[in-house]
Amino acid sequence: MSSKETNKSALPENESATSTNLSQTSAERIKALRRQKIDVEDLIQKILDGNKTALSRAITLIESQQKKHNSNIKTIIKSCLPHANKSIRIGITGVPGVGKSTFIESFGLQLISEGKKVAVLAVDPTSSITRGSILGDKTRMEKLVLEQNAFIRPTASGESLGGVARKTRESILLCEAAGYDVILVETVGVGQSETAVHSMTDFFLLLKLAGAGDELQGIKRGIIEMADAIVINKADGENIKAAKNAKVEFNRALHMYPAKQNGWSPKVKLASALKNEGIDKVWSMISKYFETTKNNGYFEQKRIDQNKFWLKQSIEDALKKNFYQNETIKKALPEIFRKIEANETTPFEAAEYLLDLLNQN
């Protein structure tokens, strides 16, 4: 018997068949759930009772692109709104490889050990090619996902940042209504996603790694300005010395920026999420921030300003969507693009023409 035949005969065929059957059963169960008529009032009550399944289903509705769900979504959010706005919203950013998932898991477990309920969401406007997600498989946070007081939700991806951000913000409200005390919003750490997360959270945390004296290279000025704290992760073993040097460098850089309106001076902390070192100090620092900003009134004012921002953003998104879905505009665009390519018109003149065309309808 050949080695290939030997290997083939050694496969656990029964186990494979069982796995296939389980997958088919799960798929059929999901399809059946989707076919069920949505009992909105029941769903709302279950969310308020802290039911994770109901919360997941409501967020799935929010992420839906189908117009038939719009009415239900509005009802759910409106009913949950009076029970929201009671959590601490923390944005966490950092480039890939900085250890965000490990940090979030360690941080989440620390919060749960102190009696908190933790929800983890993500803002990840990934391309339609990969359709990936920051969080991806929940097994990346295998300890946290098993906790009764934890809720982890990879965001829908493959669409515009505006769409993902709006849905994430609405998901925050639902998580708060479901009783979660701390909402962690993770971002991919590239593009404009940090700005979106900053506009929907109370505290913005930047994760960094210690390098070889080039810690400040490649960091966008805006990220430093937004950060309420910088945590140098993986500060353990042989990295300790480099991490301490990086801390000095970041502190020096932060002092060059003007004081913030919130009365808070951004801090730099060392941590090792893998070894669970320094995580408690990060939470103590964040708790101090909330004490400071609630006492001076900045916390409430920032929430109000964020709501105004999202009002304007929602109007802009709706106008943009209506513009591109207009049939007259759809028909006119190819010719406009041709004229721009041929240098027969300017983008500004073309835009004015299209807007006039829209107003005539």
Protein language model regions, located:
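Short hinge/gating elements
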Residues: 40-45, 98, 155, 231-236, ...
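Long, well-ordered amphipathic alpha-helical subdomains in the mid-to-C-terminal portions
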Residues: 55-57, 270, 281-358
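Alpha-helical scaffold elements adjacent to nucleotide-binding pockets in ATP/GTP-utilizing enzyme cores
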Residues: 134, 171, 196, 200, ...
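Canonical P-loop GTPase G-domain recognition
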Residues: 229, 235-292
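Intrinsically disordered, low-complexity linker/tail regions enriched in Pro/Ser/Thr
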Residues: 1-35, 264-306
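Non-catalytic terminal/linker segments enriched in charged/polar, low-complexity residues
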Residues: 1-82, 330, 334-335, 351, ...
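Flexible active-site lid/hinge loop adjacent to a nucleotide/diphosphate
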Residues: 197, 210-241
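Nucleotide-state-sensitive switch-loop elements of NTP-binding domains
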Residues: 39-98, 102-193, 200-207, 211-215
